[in-house]
A protein has these predicted regions:
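Amphipathic, small/basic residue-rich leader segments at the start of a protein or domain
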Residues: 1-88, 367-375
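Glycine-rich phosphate/cofactor-binding loops in nucleotide/flavin-utilizing enzymes
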Residues: 2-4, 9, 328-375
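C-terminal helix-coil-helix/basic helical segment that borders enzyme active sites and/or dimer interfaces
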Residues: 25-36, 262-270, 282-336
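N-terminal glycine-rich flavin-associated loop
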Residues: 81-104
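A short, Trp-centered hydrophobic/proline-enriched beta-strand micro-motif
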Residues: 115-125
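A structural signal for short hydrophobic beta-strand segments in well-ordered beta-sheet cores
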Residues: 138-141
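A short core secondary-structure module
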Residues: 152-190
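Glycine-rich beta->alpha junctions and the first turn(s) of the following alpha-helix
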Residues: 194-286
Length: 375
């Protein structure tokens, strides 16, 4: 096996369409997100990724469980992670609406993705507080018929193009005062600014400023639930599901780097040994992440927390890309663009769905409880 791209793994997951690479290149050139992605043959499948089964209108490329989603994310990461970050679909918001929304709210939200390609966003992270949701400063003040939202959000994926989404804001002090709302990101009361990036070219992350945005009472999610069930239930369901998938994206980037390196270089015996070690580490990380996803699907105790799965995958991916760059022969000319691209892109995953520092702290706090469960 000369190229990691030819591994049997490549044939197992959903095909992304023969046009995936072309679409990724157009997106990296900062083409209009909606216009470029609308041309992708696989976009309709991603547009329904995460929809509850009763809202899915096509059986084509349905991803029904977390393990299948993990495999799909790795495949997308191999082509370009920017495709996933820029894709249409309910994305992270799907978990919140499915968990907290009443029937009318779910029909209104998920129905948008049945009609046409639709982009969504998940507005939680703030400039001063980061993803420390318990310290949210964005406020939702009750008024006649609804709420007025003021504050700001940062690093909001698809924030420039989203037509719908979920917004987290504080209606009262304390942990129980945090609530989730359906909102329209295109409302004129929201000022949006696209953020400059050094990696993931084509991805649109936005800073969003809310100036007394009116949200009707009917858009408050979880009104039929106890306050103790609202925020924690929606946030943890989202993060636990998607953190391993972020790790899979990183592994996809690393696998592409391995493929590109071997395309350019005929390895010496020493380099072949290095490649063999890197591939073994890749397969180990990929298998461990897939195992946790399968355990989640089967409602079994997990061998690792979702946060640590993501952390382990990202660390391995970073190390693979870095070692490949250092091992690239100097006499082969400039480093290939694809390797520099992988180097920039893989750094982004550290800051996606929580840094490794946060996940390690979380693991240390929860480890005794996890150990007792397995005894």
């Amino acid at each position: 096996m000369n190229q990691f791209h030819d591994d049997a793994l490549s044939a197992q997951a959903c095909p992304l369409g023969e046009d995936a690479q072309q679409i990724a290149e157009q997106l990296r050139n900062f083409g209009d997100t909606r216009q470029v992605l609308s041309q992708w043959s696989f976009a309709p499948a991603l547009n329904q990724l995460g929809l509850p089964q009763r809202y899915q209108t096509s059986a084509h490329h349905q991803v029904r469980d977390l393990a299948a989603r993990y495999a799909l994310y790795e495949q997308v990461g191999f082509v370009s992670p920017a495709l996933m970050f820029s894709a249409p679909g309910p994305s992270m918001a799907a978990y919140v609406v499915a968990g907290l929304g009443n029937e009318q709210q779910q029909d209104a939200f998920f129905g948008q993705f049945q009609k046409a390609l639709c982009w969504s966003c998940f507005a939680m992270t703030e400039p001063a507080q980061g993803s420390d949701a318990g310290a949210l400063q964005t406020t939702a003040t009750a008024v006649d018929g609804g709420f007025l939202v003021s504050g700001s959000k940062m690093f909001i994926g698809n924030g420039m193009v989203a037509e719908t989404g979920v917004l987290f804001a504080r209606t009262a002090p304390g942990q129980l005062g945090i609530n989730a709302f359906l909102f329209n990101p295109q409302d004129p009361a929201i000022t949006r600014q696209r953020l400059a990036l050094t990696g993931l070219d084509g991805t649109n992350l936005a800073h969003m400023q809310f100036d007394k945005l009116f949200i009707p009472t009917g858009n408050l999610l979880g009104q039929h639930l106890k306050p103790t069930q609202r925020f924690a239930q929606s946030a943890m369901a989202t993060f636990n599901a998607l953190r391993p998938c972020v790790g899979a994206l990183a592994l996809g980037v690393a696998r592409r780097a391995l493929h590109e390196w071997q395309t350019c270089v005929t390895p010496t015996p020493t380099q072949a040994q290095l490649l063999s070690r890197l591939k073994r580490r890749w397969h180990t990380a990929h298998h461990e992440g897939l195992t946790v996803c399968q355990q989640t699907d089967e409602h079994q105790p997990s061998t690792a927390t979702p946060g640590m799965v993501k952390t382990a995958c990202v660390i391995i991916a970073e190390e693979i890309v870095s070692q490949l760059i250092h091992a690239f022969p100097a006499d082969h000319g400039p480093l290939p663009t694809a390797l520099w691209q992988a180097f920039r892109d893989v750094k982004a995953f550290e800051y996606t769905e929580g840094t490794r520092q946060i996940h390690r702290l979380s693991q240390s706090f929860s480890f005794p409880h996890a150990s007792q469960e397995h005894q």
